[in-house]
């Protein structure tokens, strides 16, 4: 966990600095970074509370099925969770896309928050699928593998921030978010399938 916190800190330091290298003023760079990290992302992550509750309820049954060697039950649970995460994420993608301006104005009086909420709402399915599958992997005793995937995801995002944001600005950071979440989702999906059929 310490490595994840360190990676997150590095990312938080890099984003304003690379935005300044792109040509933004220090004040504008901090304003954009603060809007994304302090306003937009918490709104995107809020529905994940419901997924987290479902994950906590799943852990005992997954661990029990794993101990009993019930691979079929584990596979069904994995598929059900992935489908639930996809549907749940798509619902909130639509909500955030259609109501982004209203949410930004109503909650924070920030049109910039609404703009980034519309740009980032497509991450919702990926975040919910990967979150639920990571919980299943924890139940299967694969915490180290989940940590490794998380570190790789952070490394991809940091690398893209360093290389692309100075040249393409905030759009490059949004792409880094998308690419890293796609990688995370695919990695944990492959890992869960491999673990279930091992």
Predicted regions and their residues:
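Alpha-helical transmembrane segments of polytopic membrane transporters and translocases
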Residues: 3, 29-51, 84
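C-terminal transmembrane helix end/exit motif
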Residues: 12, 134, 163, 178-198
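Interfacial transmembrane-helix starts/ends
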Residues: 37, 70-87, 91-99, 117
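Helix-loop junctions and terminal segments of transmembrane helices
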Residues: 45-68
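Helix-loop interface residues and adjacent transmembrane-helix termini in multi-pass membrane transporters
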Residues: 68, 110, 139-140, 167
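Short membrane-interface helical motifs at transmembrane helix boundaries
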Residues: 91-109, 167
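Membrane-interface junctions at transmembrane-helix termini in multi-pass inner-membrane proteins
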Residues: 122-149
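Membrane-interface helix-loop junctions in multi-pass transport and translocation proteins
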Residues: 141-144, 154-186
